[in-house]
Every structure is written in C-alpha cells, then in structure tokens.
A protein has these predicted regions:
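FNR/FR-type flavoprotein reductase catalytic core
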Residues: 1-90
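Local cysteine-cluster metal-coordination motifs and their immediate loop/turn environment
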Residues: 1-2, 90-119
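Short amphipathic alpha-helical patches
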Residues: 51, 98-102, 127
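Short microdomains enriched in Cys/His and/or Lys/Arg
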Residues: 117-128
Length: 128
C-alpha cells in the first residue's frame, strides 16, 4: 500500500481493527489521508468491527488482510457494489513453492497455491 501511494497520485484511507489498543499507526500516517480505528473493547476509536468504518462505495479499490470471515464479507460487499477488491490470503506454508500443496485454496479458477500464486488475489477470484 505504501509503495502504491509513493508511485501514484492517490488518496489512501487506512481502516484498522484491534482487540484493545492500536499500534504502529504513526508509521502509516505520512502515507495516508485518513486513519480509521475500531477496537473490540471500545478503548480506542469505534467499538465494533473494522468493516463498520467504511462504505465501500466511497473507494475505487479496497485492499484487505485479516480474518477470512472479515475479508469474505468485505470482498462480497465490494463485488456487489462494483468496487475492485484485493484480499491477502494466509495459510500455513511448508515448501513455499507450491510443490507440497499444503496451502491450496479453491478459487474461481480452480485450486491455487497461496504461496506460489498469491498471496494476494482479486476478491472475485476467492469469494465470487
């Protein structure tokens, strides 16, 4: 995200979710237009889910990482609104080159290895 910001004239809004207290946000501040925070405890920012902080229609593109249930909800919302979405998938990876098939995930294009083919995929490929 930070590399894209440096290379293109774009505005980045960072939406982050934490259990109780935020961290490392000052490292992102120089590169983003706005930082939105949600915490489970309500200690900082919005009390609730990070997905509550955004209306995807206000964005041209959404990039997400985190719990799969959150990414799925966000990606499906983006798909429904016609907003480009990228998801960063996580799996336990044994070999890192796709040989062991330990990180295989079923996609719209068949089984793909997260380590070799990803880890970032278009939301439509994973959650369509």
């Amino acid at each position: 995200m930070l590399t894209v910001k440096k290379l293109q004239d774009c505005e980045v809004t960072l939406c982050c979710g934490f259990r109780d207290k935020s961290y490392s946000l000052d490292e992102f501040a120089p590169y983003v237009k706005e930082i939105r925070v949600a915490t489970d405890s309500g200690r900082e920012g919005h009390k609730g889910f990070v997905t509550d902080l955004l209306d995807v229609a206000e964005f041209d593109c959404v990039v997400t990482c985190g719990p799969e249930v959150m990414m799925e909800k966000l990606a499906k919302t983006c798909i429904a609104k016609g907003v480009k979405c990228y998801v960063s998938m996580e799996r336990h990876m044994a070999c890192g080159v796709g040989a062991c098939l330990g990180c295989t995930h079923e996609t719209a294009h068949g089984a793909r290895c997260i380590c070799k083919d990803g880890p970032v995929f278009e939301g439509e490929e994973i959650y369509a």
